Amino acid sequence: MAPVRGILGLQRAVSIWKESNRLTPALRSFSTQAASTSTTPQPPPPPPPPEKTHFGGLKDEDRIFTNLYGLHDPFLKGAMKRGDWHRTKDLVLKGTDWIVNEMKKSGLRGRGGAGFPSGLKWSFMPKVSDGRPSYLVVNADESEPGTCKDREIMRHDPHKLLEGCLIAGVGMRASAAYIYIRGEYVNERLNLEKARREAYAAGLLGKNACGSGYDFEVYIHFGAGAYICGEETALLESLEGKQGKPRLKPPFPANAGLYGCPTTVTNVETVAVSPTILRRGPEWFSSFGRKNNAGTKLFCISGHVNKPCTVEEEMSIPLKELIERHCGGVRGGWDNLLAIIPGGSSVPLIPKNICEDVLMDFDALKAVQSGLGTAAVIVMDKSTDVVDAIARLSYFYKHESCGQCTPCREGTGWLWMIMERMKVGNAKLEEIDMLQEVTKQIEGHTICALGDAAAWPVQGLIRHFRPELERRIRERAERELLQAAA
């Protein structure tokens, strides 16, 4: 049986071999066809767009704020000529989800200092009402030293803010907006109130706003001049008629804000740019600036420059170019520069060597241990007593502390007292490290960010100008030694 099985196996093997030979030409022709098909020349994919490497030089047609200097009529007739309230009804009718998604795509980050993504923040508001109304609160309590951008919007382009309130309110499902204006801003309030009356008379606000079927009210509240009310929860407390002291979080305002209702607090500039973004498209807005730092921005430059100004420019513009293009350069030339505070008094200063190349956006300034903040650029030339300047800021934060948190209430006082002694060199070298330690005990240990704002300028001074502090201490010690010997 074994030979028979062997013969049968051999026959089976021969038949399989013959069958394979019969199929091989067909397989070869199929593989050849496939190969010829696969090797057919395909058009090359389009090259990726070149990565943008230079920022700045914003064209006039790309500016959102076209009446920043008050050269034109700030009220309704002039505003409509400049494009405000153009087909606002169509934007409203596109709905809440569309507005929020477009804002997310634009890459807009909050212009009040924190830089939180605006579309994401708006989306935190409840999607389904539990019976409580939702509110938009606009933080116009612009009190940061060096910051003067929002007042230009309220004074010269108030309808941009009012239209933005409606658009943002629809995006948040809010029934009303409260604009909280700094107490000292009298002219700004008068212009904004007149613009509000015009908008109501024209049917742009109130019942059936812009004929869209959406009811939206706008209220204007005058503050009393307290810096702490620029903190969002302190602002809500003040709006409710209480002392302006920050609240503990959670609950966050999006869950329990004004009068215990869902609330979003946002900056004047953030709200004012939203209608233009929706009209021109998020892709247009995100084409400016670096990734994650999109759009245009209002920069207010003051201090030792030839022409202080507030100007709208592209995000990520080099700091040096911003000053030389729009302010006529540093007083006495760039080589006369000592240091710059790039984002209002709450951020650490940066010395001249960093200012040479740094870009004006959130990420670039964070990388050099500073921040964009409100984009209030304070320029100090070599005539500045930098220690005295930071000591003066320390006094400001001591004066404006609400006193609720012990680290801030006590720490800001100690910062100011030590800085006053450092100013005249009346200290010991080891006290510089003690001063640094005091800032660390304040930073991150308070309910709101005022403690951080008080600590960071002092930390920046120690980081970049420690030799100056040491020089003053040594020189005073030498003088006292000589006086004692005499």
Curated annotation (Swiss-Prot):
Presequence boundaries: 1-30
Database matches in Gene3D superfamilies: 3.10.20.600, NADH-ubiquinone oxidoreductase 51kDa subunit, NADH-ubiquinone oxidoreductase 51kDa subunit, iron-sulphur binding domain
Binding-site list for NADH: G110, R111, G112, G113, A114, G115, F116, P117, S118, G119
Cellular compartments per GO CC: mitochondrial inner membrane; mitochondrion; plasma membrane
Catalytic activity: a ubiquinone + NADH + 5 H(+)(in) = a ubiquinol + NAD(+) + 4 H(+)(out)
Source organism superkingdom: Eukaryota
Membrane topology field: Peripheral membrane protein
Biased composition (Pro residues): 41-50
Binding site for FMN: 222-270
Cofactor: FMN; [4Fe-4S] cluster
Key words of the record: 4Fe-4S, Electron transport, Flavoprotein, FMN, Iron, Iron-sulfur, Membrane, Metal-binding, Mitochondrion, Mitochondrion inner membrane, NAD, Oxidoreductase, Respiratory chain, Transit peptide, Translocase, Transport, Ubiquinone
Positions of disulphide bridges: none
EC number: 7.1.1.2
Biased composition (Low complexity): 31-40
Major location (coarse): mitochondrion
Residues that bind [4Fe-4S] cluster: C402, C405, C408, C448
Region called Disordered, residue ranges: 31-57
Subcellular location: Mitochondrion inner membrane
NCBIfam families hit by this protein: nuoF_fam, PRK13596.1
Complex and partners: Complex I is composed of at least 49 different subunits. This is a component of the flavoprotein-sulfur (FP) fragment of the enzyme.
Protein known as: NADH dehydrogenase [ubiquinone] flavoprotein 1, mitochondrial
Organism, scientific name: Arabidopsis thaliana (Mouse-ear cress)
Lineage: Eukaryota, Viridiplantae, Streptophyta, Embryophyta, Tracheophyta
